[in-house]
UniProtKB/Swiss-Prot annotation:
Statement: the UniProt record of this protein carries the keyword Hydrolase: no
Regions crossing the membrane: none
Protein name in the entry: Large ribosomal subunit protein uL18
Role: This is one of the proteins that bind and probably mediate the attachment of the 5S RNA into the large ribosomal subunit, where it forms part of the central protuberance.
Example of a GO MF term: structural constituent of ribosome
GO biological process, one term: translation
PANTHER family hit by this protein: 39S RIBOSOMAL PROTEIN L18, MITOCHONDRIAL, LARGE RIBOSOMAL SUBUNIT PROTEIN UL18M
Residues spanning the signal sequence: none
InterPro entries hit by this protein: Ribosomal_uL18_bac-type, Ribosomal_uL18_bac/euk
Annotated family: Belongs to the universal ribosomal protein uL18 family.
Amino acid sequence: MISKPDKNKLRLKRHKRIRGKISGTAERPRLSVFRSNKNIYAQLIDDVEGVTLASASTNDKNISAEGSKMEQAAEVGKALAETAAKKNIKSVVFDRSGYLYHGRIQALADAARENGLEF
């Protein structure tokens, strides 16, 4: 009998492999993305100190709950880029957390790039 692999287990395996190769600093923090069925979360992390420098999610009050999930992801990317600009962060390392680079992950990344983050 053919068994179907668990998608989340494969994602976590990819995430561990990615995290072994990338790390964020205060000058160039890691932009980590988490995607659930309803929401999307993004944060800028300094791995040297182990602190979150900035964050944004669809649960924030300033991000509209209207529109599609793709539009909401783009709003999160824009909000995170604006917060980063206020803290003089221009360049980041993108951590897609094992998710494939398309859909909501790509929309968030593109919006962050359009609003001033470099990666």
